[in-house]
Curated annotation (Swiss-Prot):
<dbReference type="InterPro" id="IPR013087">
    <property type="entry name" value="Znf_C2H2_type"/>
</dbReference>
<feature type="zinc finger region" description="C2H2-type 14">
    <location>
        <begin position="724"/>
        <end position="747"/>
    </location>
</feature>
<keyword id="KW-0539">Nucleus</keyword>
<dbReference type="InterPro" id="IPR011333">
    <property type="entry name" value="SKP1/BTB/POZ_sf"/>
</dbReference>
<keyword id="KW-0677">Repeat</keyword>
<feature type="zinc finger region" description="C2H2-type 4">
    <location>
        <begin position="422"/>
        <end position="445"/>
    </location>
</feature>
<feature type="zinc finger region" description="C2H2-type 11">
    <location>
        <begin position="631"/>
        <end position="654"/>
    </location>
</feature>
<feature type="zinc finger region" description="C2H2-type 3">
    <location>
        <begin position="389"/>
        <end position="411"/>
    </location>
</feature>
<dbReference type="Pfam" id="PF00651">
    <property type="entry name" value="BTB"/>
</dbReference>
<feature type="zinc finger region" description="C2H2-type 2">
    <location>
        <begin position="361"/>
        <end position="383"/>
    </location>
</feature>
<dbReference type="GO" id="GO:0000978">
    <property type="term" value="F:RNA polymerase II cis-regulatory region sequence-specific DNA binding"/>
</dbReference>
<dbReference type="Pfam" id="PF00096">
    <property type="entry name" value="zf-C2H2"/>
</dbReference>
<dbReference type="GO" id="GO:0006357">
    <property type="term" value="P:regulation of transcription by RNA polymerase II"/>
</dbReference>
<dbReference type="InterPro" id="IPR000210">
    <property type="entry name" value="BTB/POZ_dom"/>
</dbReference>
<keyword id="KW-0804">Transcription</keyword>
<comment type="function">
    <text>May be involved in transcriptional regulation.</text>
</comment>
<feature type="zinc finger region" description="C2H2-type 13">
    <location>
        <begin position="696"/>
        <end position="718"/>
    </location>
</feature>
Length: 909
């Protein structure tokens, strides 16, 4: 029997990117008692041949796993849900706030979501009612990051919500079961500065110096290190000897340059202990701290054209020092250089130089010149070490009074005392700001000023992000920028519990939700943030129009406005509708267009219930109900409610253009009864007659109506108000149509300015196309032309069918009231036998224009309305003799007085 090959039975687990054992560089495999090795990177041909001879066996398989893939997968999913567009397929709404998520993530992490999505797999939106949005945000971030970043007082709320949503892992974590404590993350997440330090400590030191093998977090730090420490090796041997000789001079012999501890990759045993090392480490730490304190806006970038020596050096301490020195010098009445020199130390007598009628004092020690004796005497104390000014609190002495003034502010609470953190690289003197340090180098080390400037220039070069390649002028800005590429949100809002990745995002949030709105003092317009307010004031009220079109010369206030204006010349319409293919020049026009497809008519008229897509359309429509006619024709004085109507009127009447042919109405036909309507809303309102839908319900009597306007009129019944008063008598009415009926039939007054009746309105506003081959519109036009005959024949037929016993109220007169003189009472007339002669209409003019032209001209021109259309009394409108009291009420008469209906027989008798 063939000897069975022996293979290592244990499965080797190889972690990608990590060594199992630093001592194991090879993997050994035994085959036919012959052990051979091959490098982990590339096996030998003999090994491959041996493996090929082995029969398939599970023991020969190797398990390859990546420890980073799990975290990376969650990271990719978390980054994806924060992008637009993303692969998220679920929208979770909590307290009106929307959260995008992936169904698979929330379903796996929460049994609540698993049950909801299993029951309704096609659900795209889930609304939570028992959880606050701030607590749910913590839970959602836990599902994507497996971490909580909460305050201690928030833990009970998050734990309760986790139990409600059945997120088991979160419940265990918050109960501290089988997990490590949160340490400071649960209790104290102190300041953004500490978070930046932690973030910096987590960065890998992947930049190594080739001269001293030290590691740095940033490439820029390495460049600064080379410029400072190994500058001689970079500039050449000759210049290098000079730099080395200078670097190891007596002043700097005790200083051993070392990187800060958090950037140094060496062990603690290798770090040298001593005053020089400690001082340097403290210096670098203080310098970094000063850089952080100087930075105010993480996204701001400094102008490269600023002076290298004064860049970022403005400091409150230096300003106080300069101001104090200025005040001190101004307060002292110093004699000029030509006057007698006071008490000057022996050997420091100044050299007097006569220069253009002005004497200058020159120091014999340092050749520095002064124009006043007081300044020179103060300068001599630098060489003598004399300090005549003493602090009365701590008894510390100073050489100048200005320095003592600055020192005294340390004991008071007037201003914050700034520590001197900036050390001169040539004499180790400390300064409070970079500005005073730069002045010190130019004054006392002029031979090293050029080198100092070159170092500053190297430092001022941009710091670049390795991920997005964005550049910054300062390292603290880059460190804050790196937070954007992580999951940290160290900046907490002082007004709520929201956290943000940057100070700028936090500021925008505070201005929008807590501090705003910010009104303009000039026009009163409100803005969400101060930036938009400032831009509005500059551009709108400041008269700035700095953006000019190079094609037509038009000037605009905003760059975005100019960009959109240029599309007029180029014809570019970048916003394409994916539904209908229509393109738009502006994004706002495209968003308004989308409402057409989504039937998003969010603006509703309060009077008639008609809905509109745009607010300006609703504003124009409301003028129909208000009767406002603010646009007047300058030629004839006719007023219109809309400006476009005035334009059409002016062009058609006064200019003679046939503008109305451009305005052809859109018609909608009912599928049930084939009636045609002008507007879509009118068709929808009509269709309710077939469907029986009555969406408008009275809350008092539960009666329903098809039209909102009918409900509005109905609500007057439930109130005691009678807002419509008759101008000719004391009668009041609840409805306007009742008042009009009363005026027409009781007082027999009809104003020529009254709006058309219902029948007239139907005739005039009948929409008709102008094409002669359209049968539908020709038929409607013919109906309009024959309409007077229809009324006449209808009246005759109606009266012929009326029974002789029914009295027809042809002429209605007021009944004598108690206060009315008898001689003013009119006699009533009765209906003679030939009733058709009484209702015979007046002769009609047959030379009507076309119906469409009539409808248009009556709307936009001066053509009078036809007022001679007869309104016959229909049988269903006739009153029963027993209901005479209702007619009296309708006409505004006294309820106790009936209306006299005299029959024909009574008249003959």
């Amino acid at each position: 029997m063939k000897k069975r090959r022996k293979v290592t039975s244990n499965l080797e687990k190889i972690h990608l990117g990590y060594h199992k054992d630093s001592s194991e560089g090879n993997v050994a495999v035994e085959c036919d008692q012959v052990t051979y090795t091959h490098s982990a990177g590339r096996p030998t041909p003999e090994a491959l041949h041996c493996y090929q001879e082995l029969p398939p066996s599970p023991d020969q398989r190797k398990l390859l796993s990546s420890l980073q893939y799990n975290k990376n997968l969650l990271k990719y999913l978390n980054d994806d849900r924060q992008k637009q567009p993303s692969f998220c397929d679920l929208l979770i709404i909590v307290e009106g706030k929307e959260f995008s998520a992936h169904k698979v993530v929330v379903a796996v992490g929460s049994s609540y979501f698993h049950a909801c999505l299993s029951k309704n797999p096609s659900t795209d939106v889930v609304t939570l009612d028992h959880v606050t949005h701030s607590v749910f945000q913590h839970l959602l971030e836990f599902l994507y990051t497996s971490e909580f970043f909460v305050y201690k007082y928030e833990i009970p709320l998050v734990l309760e919500a986790a139990k409600f949503l059945d997120i088991i892992d979160a419940v265990k974590l918050l109960n501290n079961e089988n997990v490590a404590p949160f340490h400071s993350e649960l209790t104290e997440k102190s300041s953004p500065e500490e978070t930046l330090n932690e973030l910096t400590g987590r960065l890998s030191n992947n930049h190594q110096c080739k001269f001293c093998s030290r590691h740095f977090c940033y490439k820029k730090s390495l460049e600064n290190h080379l410029a400072k420490t190994h500058r001689s090796l970079l500039l050449g041997k000759k210049h290098g000897l000079k730099m080395l000789e200078r670097s190891f001079s007596a002043r700097r012999s005790k200083r051993n340059r070392k990187c800060p501890v958090k950037f140094d990759d060496t062990s603690d045993d290798e770090q040298e202990s001593g005053d020089g090392s400690d001082n340097l480490n403290q210096e670098n730490f203080d310098k970094e701290k000063s850089d952080r304190n100087d930075s105010e806006d993480p996204g701001s970038e400094y102008n490269a054209e600023e002076d290298e020596l004064e860049e970022e050096m403005s400091d409150e301490y230096s300003d106080i020092e300069e101001q104090s020195e200025k005040d001190h010098n101004d307060a002292e009445e110093e004699p000029e250089a030509g006057d007698s020199v006071g008490n000057v130390h022996e050997g420091l007598t100044p050299v007097v130089i006569q220069n253009s009628n002005k004497k200058i004092l020159q120091c014999p020690k340092c050749d520095k010149t002064f124009d006043r004796i007081g300044k020179y005497e103060s300068h001599t104390r630098v060489h003598t070490g004399e300090k005549p000014f003493e602090c009365d609190i701590c008894h510390q002495r100073y050489s100048t009074k200005s320095n003592l003034t600055v020192h005294r502010k340390k004991h008071s609470n007037e201003t914050e005392f700034h520590k001197k953190e900036h050390k001169c690289p040539y004499c180790n003197k400390l300064h409070a700001s970079k500005k005073t340090l730069a002045k010190h180098v130019k004054r006392f080390h002029p031979e090293n000023a050029q080198e100092f400037i070159s170092i500053k220039k190297t430092k001022s070069e941009s710091w670049k992000c390795d991920i997005c390649k964005k550049s910054f002028t300062r390292r603290p800005h880059l460190e804050e920028h790196m937070i954007l590429h992580s999951q940290d949100k160290p900046f907490k809002c002082t007004y709520c519990e929201e956290h943000f990745k940057s100070r700028f995002a936090r500021l925008k949030h505070q201005e929008k939700f807590h501090l705003g709105p910010f009104p303009c003092d000039i026009c009163g317009r409100q803005f969400n943030d101060t930036g938009n307010l400032k831009r509005h004031i500059e551009c709108t009220h400041g008269g700035k129009r700095k953006w000019t079109c190079f094609i037509c010369g038009k000037s605009v206030r905003e760059r975005t406005t100019l960009k959109e204006h240029l599309r007029i010349h180029s014809g570019e319409k970048p916003h394409l509708c994916s539904i209908c293919g229509q393109s738009f020049r502006h994004g706002s026009s495209y968003r308004l267009h989308l409402r057409v497809h989504h039937d998003d008519k969010r603006y509703e008229c309060d009077e008639c219930g008609k809905t509109f897509i745009r607010h300006d359309h609703l504003t124009k429509h409301k003028k129909i109900h208000s009767g406002e006619k603010a646009h007047q024709c300058e030629e004839c004085g006719k007023c219109f409610g809309r400006r476009d109507h005035l334009t059409v009127h002016y062009k058609s009447v006064h200019l003679g253009e046939k503008v109305w042919q451009k305005y052809k109405a859109t018609f909608h036909q009912c599928d049930v009864c084939k009636k045609i309507f002008k507007g879509k809303s009118s068709l929808e309102m009509h269709f309710r007659t077939h469907s029986g839908e009555k969406p408008y319900k009275c809350q008092i009597c539960n009666q329903s109506f098809r039209i909102k306007k009918t409900l509005t009129k109905h609500l007057v019944i439930h109130s005691d108000a009678r807002p419509f008063n008759c101008q000719h008598c004391n009668a009041t009415f609840k409805r306007k149509d009742k008042l009009k009926y009363h005026i027409d039939h009781v007082h027999e007054i009809k104003s020529p300015d009254d709006p058309l009746s219902t029948s007239e309105e139907k005739l005039v506003s009948l929409p008709v196309e102008y094409s002669s081959d359209d049968k539908i519109f020709q038929t409607e036009t013919k109906q309009y032309m024959d309409q007077p005959k229809v009324y006449q024949s209808e009246a005759k037929t109606m009266l012929q069918n009326v029974s002789a016993e029914v009295c027809v109220p042809v002429t209605l007169v007021p009944v004598q009231m108690p206060d009315t003189p008898s001689d003013l009472v009119r006699h009533t007339t009765t209906l003679p036998p030939s009733s058709h002669e009484i209702l015979s209409p007046q002769p009609q003019s047959t030379d009507y224009p076309r119906a469409a032209d009539l409808a248009f001209l009556e709307k936009y021109t001066l053509t009078p309305q036809p007022a001679n259309i007869v309104h016959p009394v229909r049988p269903e409108q006739m009153l029963d003799p027993r209901e005479q009291s209702y007619l009296g009420t309708l006409l505004g008469l006294d309820s106790t007085t009936g209306v006299q209906n005299i029959s024909t027989n009574e008249h003959h008798s």
